[in-house]
């Protein structure tokens, strides 16, 4: 029988405090220097997520298409340049934010950050790539609808947020197919503006890396005040209950539980 580890109180937890820096244009940047290996992660975070588009698929599709081409590089050139320099780029959309995460070797940092800046500031929204992404998203949705965990998550969101919130509306193949390049461009212009941006640099941070970030992102003109993502307040009144979704022939069951707590607009958030 496997010997279980001893239960004891946690001790010696070290929480690293980030250093704050302001880029030349006023963008806030946090840096956390930890680790011994010469690698780093650069996160570019924007206000605006699934709550803020016509439907929650808009922000997800925008995050996906950013890597598919800029006004100076196509998708293949972006992929080859990052791969050649040992870098990897992840793009993600959450309820209230979109995040681009660049993982890089420090020795190639100054070569790949300009590519990230080009992706952030100059996306081209190529029609063919958008069509491919929509097909992939629709196919992924069909597969997910066969999974009990996805159905539980979807039903919970509908019950908790209601149809008056983007987070409570189900994603459909029709809502995916209706997204256009012009809609993504408009969302990008509204939310992916410098005033809505924050930067986090972590890893074995070196002084010259801060200068590279400032050179690539600190020159972008900032106009207007930062925008606040839409509220995630449920559109229906909370009432404890149990919802059962029957899926014939399912080999597993999934349970999802939740309740309202503080919102982003609450003073205690």
Q: Can you say where each PLM-predicted feature lies in the sequence?
A:
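Scaffold signal of the M16-like zinc-metallopeptidase fold and its non-catalytic homologs
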Residues: 1, 144-194, 214-216
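M16 family metallopeptidases and their MPP-like homologs
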Residues: 30-32, 37-64, 74-121, 150-174, ...
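Short beta-strand/turn micro-motifs at beta-sheet edges
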Residues: 29-33, 87-91, 185-188, 242-246
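An aromatic/glycine/proline-enriched structural segment found at the starts
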Residues: 1-14, 19, 163, 167-170, ...
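Structured segments of extracytoplasmic/periplasmic soluble domains
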Residues: 64-69, 81, 85, 119-123, ...
